[in-house]
């Protein structure tokens, strides 16, 4: 991880890490009403800060902020970032999130609050993925690449719900082992 951090720092300006708010596990009992008298806003789970290695030039181009679908040949991605994404090495700092108890190694990928709010309105059962702690890798990630539209998210949701139904230590081990060929075979981002 030190080598990756040095490469990022030597080849582009800005921080080595990229942080962003994501939505974590929703500890309410399933079927409980979404409101909570102590919360002003129901965000569908506990927000947390996710850590990644920075793969894009900071605030470059028209997409300086906000949520955007990942783009093939995105001009914002740095040369080092392209390699990190290809091998999914940009996800390594999420081990910090695992140690903090915010994520597991295996589980549905955590989403940004604004995207989560929109998707749970558009896609039936989307909020059910919050019944488990989010993960660095998951059943959806080894079966499908990055999302580029809502239909991709629907397909990934089917995998996430299947994982939740079958979740066990043995299933997690199987997914971790199946993640290795995805990483080694460069089946990550474009």
Predicted region positions:
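C-terminal terminal-structure detector
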Residues: 123-190
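Residue-level recognition of specific faces of alpha-helices
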Residues: 52, 76-79, 141, 172
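Positions in alpha-helical segments
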Residues: 18, 78-82, 159
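Adenylate-forming
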Residues: 4-5, 50, 64-67, 139-141
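A short, structured surface patch at a secondary-structure boundary
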Residues: 2, 56, 70-133, 175-183
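A hydrophobic, helix-centered structural microdomain
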Residues: 1-59, 169-190
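Cytochrome P450 core scaffold surrounding the K-helix E-X-X-R motif
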Residues: 59-65, 109-115, 150
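The feature captures the short pre-catalytic strand/loop hairpin that immediately precedes
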Residues: 60, 67-76, 151-155
């Amino acid at each position: 991880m030190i080598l990756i951090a040095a490469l990022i720092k030597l080849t582009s300006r800005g921080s080595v890490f990229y942080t962003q708010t994501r939505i974590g596990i929703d500890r309410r009992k399933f079927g409980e009403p979404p409101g909570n008298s102590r919360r002003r806003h129901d965000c569908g789970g506990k927000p947390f800060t996710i850590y990644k290695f920075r793969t894009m030039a900071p605030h470059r181009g028209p997409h300086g902020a906000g949520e955007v679908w990942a783009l093939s040949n995105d001009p914002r991605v740095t040369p080092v970032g392209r390699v990190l994404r290809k091998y999914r090495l940009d996800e390594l700092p999420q081990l910090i999130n695992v140690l903090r108890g915010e994520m597991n190694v295996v589980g549905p990928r955590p989403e940004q609050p604004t995207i989560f709010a929109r998707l749970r309105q558009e896609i039936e059962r989307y909020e059910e993925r919050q019944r488990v702690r989010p993960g660095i890798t998951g059943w959806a990630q080894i079966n499908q690449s990055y999302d580029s539209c809502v239909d991709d998210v629907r397909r990934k949701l089917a995998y996430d719900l299947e994982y939740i139904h079958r979740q066990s230590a043995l299933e997690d081990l199987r997914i971790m082992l199946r993640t290795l060929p995805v990483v080694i075979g460069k089946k990550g981002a474009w």
